[in-house]
């Protein structure tokens, strides 16, 4: 959507705008800069109305305002810019309602998209391979590789990884039972390499675990490993394996999502695998059955196939 309207506005659209500009100048006392911003935003939207065949502001409804916000998102506008555009519309329609030219403000209930936090830069497949190429045979190294393989193989959150109990490893099915946000349980697939290293870890876990400890991954003290310990160990392995990027549990999860999405182009499957209720602020949760998820996972995940058996 261009910043300046290229289409002449009919009087039915232009005159209410002119009255509003005068109101901003004489009664609101806004600066020239702010007035120009209002003018730019509103006349751009008025030109868009003309392209849709609308000739009067009273024809605008909430659906049109939402479509306008969505259009801005599709065109790559920043969330803050869309919020400014909606704010201009709300102020203008409040003015028209006050003057009796409209009965209600159609922009009143339309929210601007939330400003999203930037996602961390993901590791590429080669960097993941470099990080996970841990072949030391002491119990802590085996544990650490198993943790990283599971986190990347299933796209788990840090809390989900730490919360896994022995009973949650469903080896025959190639699944791990995890408790996600809101205490919601789901079964996550994990790759052949992740399963291979979990099996190796289980063989040496007894050397560290305290009697009766139910956690899959334990610390040197024999109890469930802490969030901070996982973060610290991953950072250390990133440096030891000479991976250029800073390593964090969330970066592994983000890398999982990016790699599977790039391979499968199946956004809904990735949504389900990650345990997300909402795929974005504009998309609702779509459930896929586990068989379809597992199939998409097996075909797409770069470490999903175990090496040829001996």
Swiss-Prot record:
> Where does the record say this protein resides?
Cytoplasm
Provide the GO biological process annotations.
Answer: cell division; chromosome segregation; DNA transposition
Keyword hit for Protein biosynthesis:
no
Active-site residues? 157, 181, 250, 253, 276, 285
Query: Which positions form S-S bridges?
Result: none
Is Cell division among this UniProt entry's keywords? Answer: yes
Residue stretches making up the Core-binding (CB) domain: 11-97
Keywords in alphabetical order, please: Cell cycle, Cell division, Chromosome partition, Cytoplasm, DNA integration, DNA recombination, DNA-binding
UniProt-recorded Gene Ontology molecular function terms: DNA binding; tyrosine-based site-specific recombinase activity
User: Per the UniProt record, which residue ranges are transmembrane?
Assistant: none
- Which residue numbers delimit the Tyr recombinase domain? 118-298
Q: Mind telling me which GO cellular component terms the entry cites?
A: cytoplasm
**How does this chain assemble?**
Forms a cyclic heterotetrameric complex composed of two molecules of XerC and two molecules of XerD.
Main role? Answer: Site-specific tyrosine recombinase, which acts by catalyzing the cutting and rejoining of the recombining DNA molecules. The XerC-XerD complex is essential to convert dimers of the bacterial chromosome into monomers to permit their segregation at cell division. It also contributes to the segregational stability of plasmids.
Q: Which family does it belong to?
A: Belongs to the 'phage' integrase family. XerC subfamily.
Can you say what this protein is called? Tyrosine recombinase XerC
Organism of origin is Vibrio atlanticus (strain LGP32) (Vibrio splendidus (strain Mel32))
Its taxonomic placement starts with: Bacteria, Pseudomonadati, Pseudomonadota, Gammaproteobacteria, Vibrionales
């Amino acid at each position: 959507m261009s910043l300046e309207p290229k289409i002449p506005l009919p009087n039915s659209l232009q005159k209410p705008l002119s009255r509003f500009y005068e109101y901003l100048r004489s009664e609101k006392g806004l600066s020239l800069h702010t007035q120009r911003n209002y003018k730019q935003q509103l006349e751009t939207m008025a030109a868009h109305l003309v392209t849709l065949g609308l000739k009067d502001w009273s024809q605008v409804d909430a659906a049109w305002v939402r479509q306008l916000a969505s259009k801005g998102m599709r065109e790559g506008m920043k969330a803050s810019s869309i919020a400014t555009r909606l704010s201009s519309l709300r102020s203008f329609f409040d003015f028209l309602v006050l003057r009796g030219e409209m009965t209600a403000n159609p922009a009143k209930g339309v929210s601007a998209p939330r400003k999203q936090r930037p996602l961390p830069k993901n590791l590429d497949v080669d960097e993941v391979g470099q990080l996970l190429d841990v072949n030391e045979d002491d119990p802590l190294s085996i544990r650490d590789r198993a943790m990283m393989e599971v986190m990347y193989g299933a796209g788990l959150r840090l809390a989900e990884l730490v919360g896994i109990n022995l009973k949650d490893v469903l080896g025959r099915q190639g699944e791990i039972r995890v408790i996600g946000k809101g205490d919601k349980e789901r079964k996550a697939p994990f790759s052949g390499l992740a399963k291979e290293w979990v099996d190796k870890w289980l063989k040496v876990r007894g050397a560290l675990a305290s009697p009766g400890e139910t956690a899959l991954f334990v610390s040197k003290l024999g109890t469930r490993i802490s969030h901070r310990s996982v973060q610290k160990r991953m950072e250390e392995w990133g440096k030891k394996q000479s991976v250029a990027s800073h390593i964090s549990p969330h970066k592994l999860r983000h890398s999982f999502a990016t790699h599977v999405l790039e391979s499968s182009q199946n956004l809904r499957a990735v949504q389900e695998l990650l345990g997300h209720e909402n795929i974005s602020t504009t998309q609702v949760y779509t459930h896929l059955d586990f068989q379809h998820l597992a199939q998409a996972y097996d075909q797409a995940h770069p470490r999903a196939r175990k090496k040829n058996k001996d």
